[in-house]
Amino acid sequence: MNTPQEIYQLSYDYMFVVFAGTGATFFYNLFSNILRALGDSKTPLYFLVISSLLNIFLDILFIVPFKMGVAGAAWATVLSQLISAVLCALYAVKHFPVTRLKKEDWKSNAETHAKHLKIAFPMGFQMSVMCIGQLAMQSAVNKIGTNAIAGYTAASKIDQMSILVNNAFGITISNYVAQNYGAGLIGRIKKGVKSCLMIGHAGNLFMGILILATQSFVIPIFMNEPNEEIFLYAKDYLWVIVPFYLLLGLLAIYRSSIQSMGDSVTPFLACIIELFSRIFCALYLSLYFGYKGICFSTPFAWIGALCILIPVYYRTIRKISLEKMSKGNYSNLKRKIRKV
């Protein structure tokens, strides 16, 4: 990872806290997805917003008044997810009796485990591929120096707000498409995706303007002490990444829609393209353009993934529509024959 020796211990402290708190992340995702599976997509979104705002508040609290440094940032992440996990669990148990487990529910079922693993392994591998790309970027940033690392980290914290918003769009359209795909309502899928894209564009435009307008005030919040070089590194990252937020919205919505129509291969291939795009930019663009070349690796990765996701989405919609039309024509023909 090319981590500078002077910040190795800080990195170790952050990683130790985050890995120790993996259970909080697991249970938060578990209960929020249980609620979505039971048809309640609004409540997990509310808890996601609460978790994000709480994370930002705790970041400021632990870093500024308490002087806990990077370990404080890690604790802020873990505690915000833990609190949200508890809220999700309490809400689920209170409002959905099916989540109140009995003794017999704890019996092991090999068939159920196999079904879960069949879905979990591809998704887990997909997320791992995305993380490898981010590690390549971080490794390239680490070569530049500690100020670049601090600036990149501060900007990433701010950028995370937009990522969470777009993930929410992806989760929303995923549930919507899955329900309508199961019911064979292709027209509703097209309308829903179109509406989500429009809302996503508006949301990303607003988020982008807000971030760029307030960056001079927000960036210092995530800095331990005033430093002009760190500030400029963070600012450069935001000016590169923010104008491409519209692509992030497209990526989240199209990928989730395709997955919800039963295609797990295409999103996986899109992740592979993202991975190689990030690695290529991190290794080669950084040689010619330095830090800004690394920053551009994320937008290039989004563009690469969209090159496969967008055509596949519209081809899938067209294919399903034609199949439905053929079945409808066949049914009409059978009715006419019966009448004769």
Q: What feature does the model see in each segment?
A:
Residues E6-L10, V70-A71, T112-I119, V141-Q160, ...:
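Interfacial/gating helices of multi-pass transporter permease domains
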Residues V17, Y28, S51, S80-S84, ...:
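Transmembrane helical elements of multi-pass membrane transporters/channels
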Residues S52-V86, F217, L275-C307, P311:
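Membrane-interface helix-loop junctions in multi-pass transport and translocation proteins
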